[in-house]
Design a protein with these regions (language model features):
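Aromatic-lined carbohydrate-binding/catalytic grooves of carbohydrate-active enzymes
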Residues: 121-225
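Long, charged amphipathic helices and adjacent flexible linkers at domain junctions
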Residues: 108-123, 128
Length: 225
């Protein structure tokens, strides 16, 4: 939702300390001239090429200048460098447009397509995706997934994504997140067997991960509490 806040000498901060960004705490913001509109007016946009905990602040100085800080969240963060070592921070990007909010959106869109998207996907239509989550959530077998794959192909889908539940003892959202070994009870032929059968239907095969999270009830957490 579009929210506007005046820039004053009081610092305005946006941050995430949860290890994630996403739509809950996007590390992006705009600085807009008072007369900026959708198609006219000066707008500066900022974003961070990083999906972890982040911090940004905007403040007007005593001289009337706008100061922006943007980067990794300092909360609970430290990194010791030995002599000769280096630490590379996430890249912060800034864009400017005199064509309003629509102009800055287009500017960032061009940047993402030209500089961030893998070369194979530049200016290429994305495949139509079927995701297994709404169809079966954690309750599936290989046979059920293949039935869904057949229906997805009939609907014109091109990529079948197997969502949560394929690993560990993941029968609910209370355990196993982080234990990315195949659940042989659900997938006796493994991911390779399922993928080959979906490929034979003419579907690409994709897989869901949530690498930024871990369940307390998991082997990974017990090994690294």
């Amino acid at each position: 939702q579009h929210t506007e806040t005046p820039i004053t000498m009081a610092r305005t901060c946006l941050e995430s300390t949860t290890g994630a960004s996403s739509s809950r705490a996007n590390p992006g913001f705009l600085l807009a001239a008072p007369d900026a509109a959708e198609t006219a007016g000066e707008v500066c946009g900022f974003n961070l090429l990083y999906s972890g905990s982040h911090y940004l602040s905007v403040q007007k100085s005593l001289q009337g200048l706008t100061r922006v800080m943007h980067g990794i969240s300092p909360a609970n963060f430290n990194w010791e460098l030995a002599p000769g070592e280096r630490f590379e921070t996430p890249e912060a990007v800034m864009a400017w447009s005199d064509a309003g909010f629509g102009g800055i959106t287009d500017c960032f869109g061009r940047y993402v397509n030209e500089a961030l998207i893998p070369p194979y996907w530049k200016n290429r239509p994305r495949p139509i995706v079927y995701n297994s989550w709404e169809g079966c959530m954690f309750d599936f077998t290989e046979a059920k997934l293949l039935r869904l794959g057949k229906l997805a192909k009939q609907l014109g889908c091109e990529l079948f994504v197997l969502d949560d539940g394929w690993f560990g003892k993941r029968d609910s959202d209370t355990s196993s997140l982080g234990d990315y070994s195949v659940n042989a009870k659900k997938l006796p032929n493994g991911l390779k067997g399922l993928g080959e059968k979906l490929n034979a239907m003419g579907l690409q095969f994709g897989l869901w991960f949530e690498p930024e999270s871990v369940s307390p009830d998991s082997a990974l957490y017990r090994q690294h509490p």
